[in-house]
UniProtKB/Swiss-Prot annotation:
Encoding gene, per UniProt annotation: IFT57
Compositional bias ranges of the Acidic residues kind: 239-248
Pfam families, alphabetized: IFT57
Protein name: Intraflagellar transport protein 57
Function of the molecule: Required for the maintenance and formation of cilia.
UniProtKB keywords: Cell projection, Cilium, Coiled coil
Length: 469
């Protein structure tokens, strides 16, 4: 089920020949289902060797490619089947709410209307697969920077021993296409290999169908219909025929089957008694004549029928057999030329790897420095975002204080309360003046009354003195 992958870059191959002291072993492709007849000869062939075992302490293989050679739709169909082997529907789709829908067989192969949702599904699935592969990556968020998220995913994939892709990380931001399918397919293959998953040949059960190559021609169909017509014969005649056939197979050493003293004869008679039909032959024949036309099946000629395909296959086989001797020499010469060219390419590749080894080391150091600077930049960006949020919060508080000050200032600048206070003071002064006048009048009245009372008392005292004298 593994898809065909492109070779890695020639410059990136040699520096990554081994990880943790293990040499690179090319990925063994499992045999395609249904090809066990021709791949291994007449006996079905030996099963393909299993993929190399995974190493617990590091990457399984080095120099894997993230680029596919098949079309995205074909690779996506195989990717959906591989994800089912990892039980992603339970472990990924239904791990937390809201639940995700399982992938269709063309989800990442074609663009969808909601590209942001498609990209978020890709980043979440890639992060989950990286976690299964042993690389912890923070869970992506829906509104994260797409370019930064894609760079983080490719950086984590590179730690597993994958060769750097030839395309730019921004190709992954669209959320679909061969680049996205290639990344997911490579990660799924890596996880399956890490779990020591082995592909086995499919087991086909015997469903009672005729094997390929067996043709039911018109003569066989006619013979079958004749067999159906023979059922219309009387049951008694059939019983007689059975008796004749049984008479032929009588064992001479045991005597006649009808002779006395033989147990086989009694058992055979009992069997015959069971097999004798009690149906009226005439009614049987009438019923058969009524039902037989309904049981006849006429198979129309179809260009898509397997018989026509088999005939075409035989014709193609004959054409290939005739053309093979002439083309074999040309193919052998072409193979020799290709082998020579491959040897030259390998020699040239080794020379280039040795020549650019120092540049590759400088490139790795520059990439490491760039990664550190990028992380520092991300931290600074987060700090700036926090400061901006704090500045916005302080600005909102300042606006509220300004509004309160403006309200107080407007109240202070308003002269209406002062005028009211002055009017009230004048009214109070007037009332105080009136009260003082009234108090003076009352005091004068009291003074007069006290003087009058004093005179009366003096007069009474004088009268009382005179009376005493």
């Amino acid at each position: 089920m593994s898809s065909k992958r492109g070779g890695r870059s020639s410059l990136a191959k040699a520096p990554e020949e081994a990880v943790n002291g293990e040499a690179f072993a090319p990925e063994a492709s499992p045999p395609p289902p249904g090809d066990d007849g021709d791949a291994g000869g007449e006996d079905g062939g030996a099963p393909a060797p299993p993929p190399p075992p995974a190493t617990k302490g590091g990457p399984v293989a080095v120099g894997r490619s993230l680029e596919i050679q098949t079309t995205p739709d074909v690779c996506m169909e195989m990717l959906a089947d591989k994800l089912k082997l990892l039980n992603y529907e339970a472990d990924f789709c239904r791990k937390k709410k809201p639940y995700r829908k399982p992938l269709s067989r063309l989800y990442f192969a074609v663009p969808l209307a909601n590209s942001s949702e498609q990209f978020f599904y890709f980043t979440s699935l890639a992060t989950w697969l990286l976690g299964l592969a042993g690389v912890e990556l923070p869970a992506p968020k829906e509104f994260d920077d797409p370019n930064l998220t894609c760079q983080n995913i490719l950086g984590a994939v590179k730690k597993l021993g994958f060769a750097p892709p030839s395309y730019h990380p921004t190709k992954l931001t669209v959320g679909n296409g061969k680049e996205v399918v290639g990344v997911l397919d490579g990660l799924v293959d890596f996880v399956l290999e890490r779990r020591h998953h082995k592909y086995s040949r499919p087991a086909y059960g015997n469903d009672g169908q005729p094997e390929e190559g067996v043709q039911l021609d018109d003569e066989a169909e006619a013979a079958a219909m004749e067999g159906a017509d023979e059922l219309a014969m009387p049951a008694q005649n059939q019983a007689d025929d059975d008796e004749e056939e049984e008479g032929v197979y009588v064992d001479p050493g045991r005597g006649d089957a009808a002779g006395p003293g033989t147990g086989a004869s009694a058992a055979m008679d009992a069997e015959k008694a069971v097999l004798v039909s009690k149906v009226d032959p005439t009614l049987w024949k009438i019923e058969l004549e009524r039902v037989a036309p309904k049981l006849r099946i006429t198979i129309a000629a179809d260009s898509k029928d397997w018989r026509s395909h088999l005939d075409e296959a035989h014709q193609h086989k004959e054409v290939i057999s005739k053309a093979w001797p002439d083309s074999k020499t040309s193919l052998e010469r072409l193979r020799a030329d290709l082998n020579g060219t491959l040897e030259k390419l390998q020699t040239r590749e080794k020379f280039l790897n040795e020549q650019f080894e120092s540049l590759m080391q400088q490139y790795r150091a520059a990439r490491t420095t760039f990664t550190d600077v990028q992380e520092t930049y991300n931290r600074k960006t987060e700090a700036v975002a926090d400061r901006n949020q704090e500045m916005h919060r302080i600005g909102e508080t300042l606006e509220e204080v300004k509004a309160m000050m403006d309200e107080k200032g407007s109240n202070i600048a308003d002269a209406t309360p002062v005028a009211r206070i002055k009017t009230a003071i004048k009214q109070l002064n007037k009332e105080l003046h009136d009260m003082e006048v009234r108090i003076g009048v009352v005091s004068h009245t009291l003074l007069q009354l006290s003087l009058r009372n004093k005179r009366l008392l003096q007069a009474q005292a004088a009268l009382s003195d005179e009376e005493e004298d």
